[in-house]
């Protein structure tokens, strides 16, 4: 195989998820010491709808992050998976009591997207009451 062709194959592998853009890579990035990197990882994982079985547990863990933005974005991402994230319901119910209103709000919305029986989050839940 020629040198140019090897580079094309390598680039295609990277684009196809075998390299830095793989699900495993982004799950590992949820442990980054940099909060912006963790948020970027949440957003990247949110786009991988066909891999919920691997991603949802990682996002549930991210709901415990020290950073408010990571917790909020994790709740939003879980909601985007809909019923595939039903294992996240207990963790999201816990997040309804988060100290930050934006996290509580995101958790309530996520719960309503995962299971409509949870209904729309009440303003009371968003206030943590």
Name what the model sees in each region.
Residues 1-16:
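Sec-dependent bacterial lipoprotein signal peptides
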Residues 4-7, 73, 77, 87, ...:
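Positively charged, low-complexity intrinsically disordered regions
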Residues 5, 30-36, 63, 81, ...:
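Compositionally biased regions
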Residues 7-11, 27, 42, 56, ...:
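Generic N-terminal initiation segments characterized by hydrophobic and/or small/turn-forming residues
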Residues 19, 36-51, 69-84, 104-117:
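Structural detector for internal amphipathic alpha-helices that build alpha-solenoid repeat scaffolds
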Residues 33-34, 66-67, 99-100:
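Short inter-helical turns and helix N-cap capping residues of alpha-solenoid HEAT/ARM repeat scaffolds
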């Amino acid at each position: 195989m020629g040198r140019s062709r090897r580079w094309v194959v390598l680039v295609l592998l990277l684009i196809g998820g075998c390299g830095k853009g793989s699900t495993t890579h982004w799950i590992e990035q949820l442990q980054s010491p940099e909060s912006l990197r963790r948020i970027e990882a949440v957003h990247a994982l949110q786009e991988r709808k066909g891999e919920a079985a691997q991603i949802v547990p990682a996002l549930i863990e991210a709901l415990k992050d020290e950073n408010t933005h990571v917790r909020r974005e994790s709740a939003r991402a879980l909601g985007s998976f809909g019923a595939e994230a039903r294992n996240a319901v207990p963790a999201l119910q816990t997040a309804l009591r988060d100290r930050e209103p934006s996290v509580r709000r995101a958790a309530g919305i996520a719960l309503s997207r995962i299971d409509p029986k949870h209904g729309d989050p009440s303003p009371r839940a968003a206030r943590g009451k």
